[in-house]
Amino acid sequence: MTESATPAHTLDCIGLYCPEPLFQAREGIDAIAVGEVLEVFADDPAAEEDLKRFAKRAGHEVVGCEMDGCQLRILIRRLK
């Protein structure tokens, strides 16, 4: 995990299931400035793959991703 990537905004998607974490991440990315980082917490098993795929397709960068038990923490930097 890249700890130097300080989040500008944090989303708590614990308890939400596909596609809700993805929808919230899209809105969260739109709400931050280019260069800032969005932090997302989720426990949906599909969230990691969905959020990584979203970031890649949208032209953003995943700067960190870790699992703590069944809880995902992912950091996405807005690039455009």
Predicted region positions:
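Right-handed parallel beta-helix/beta-solenoid
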Residues: 2-12
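Short, flexible, glycine/charge-rich loop motifs used to bind or transfer phosphoryl groups or to couple energy/partner
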Residues: 1-2, 28
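Core SAM-dependent methyltransferase catalytic element
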Residues: 73-80
